[in-house]
Amino acid sequence: MADYVYGLLHGVDEKKRIIAIKVNKKVTFYYMAKGMFQSFMQYFKSGIYVFMDVQETSRRYRGYTVKNVLNIEKVMSPHRQNPTIYYDVSIIKSGISHIMNTKKPKLFLDFEMSMPPYRNYEDFVSEIIQVGFILTDATGEIIDKQSYFIKTFLFKEISDRTKKFLRVEQEQIDSGLEYREFYDLFTKLLQTYKPMVLVWGQNDRIELKKMNFRHQLADFTPNTQFVDLLKLHKTYFNLKNDLGLFNAYFLYYENDIDKQKHDALEDARVTKAVFDGFLEVCNNLRMLSLNTTNELLGRRENQNETEE
């Protein structure tokens, strides 16, 4: 459980990452994790008010009785009718909600990459070997979905590790598209629909950029709107660590599909499902907070440990 606390900043112990808040003439102390403290330290000046979620229970820490800070909601300085807002998570969430509700076609994209061999992998360079995407119109209706295998360029044969992990055979790669063929199909799709491209993490955009450079093709990624759903989740829920795609799916549907196929189209489908769940959160149709996120992920970890 968490408590909501707000009050005037009374003092800061930078070495111990503790802030003191004064409420009704009473001073209480709160401990912040290193990353959080570094992010907000610039705002901790005299006259600042801090609004935050903290742990319900107290503990002793290096001479203080403290509660751990879970999340900072707002940092402001009152100036009569015109307070100065230094940080407000509600404004940030509003911006994320605006992105999520943008009325334009959306392309949910995922790649599978070649993997290095078990030995002699020093000169190995990964390549896109499978593409999966789902295209929706501005209303969210699916208008296309495709899956392609892509022929490798630098290493003609995929490694045994790739075959085992992705459950793919060399024949499937050999019968796939040349990257230039995929490039033509993909750029035509982008020009036709001008979609928002939704990915989980930054790797897909980075790998596309590398492949375009490797094949001496014009790089379209700077002029394409890529939206990283992982980054939006970390910002919206104030997550300290990266969240895996299938953990995110579990948050919304509590259905464990960890035994994934390692298939690009399947991962694109999961990305779309996560988008749909997150959109409901942004539009207040589903309740999900930092606390419930941690609780659900903890439950999933316990289930997996029990199964093992």
Residue spans of the language-model regions?
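N-terminal accessory regions of nucleic-acid-interacting proteins
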Residues: 1-104
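Substrate-recognition/cap helix-loop segment adjacent to the acidic, metal-dependent catalytic center
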Residues: 205-224
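Short, glycine/acidic-enriched loop or turn micro-motifs at the edges of active sites
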Residues: 111-115, 231, 270
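Conserved non-catalytic scaffold segment of RNase H-like nuclease domains
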Residues: 101-105, 113-205
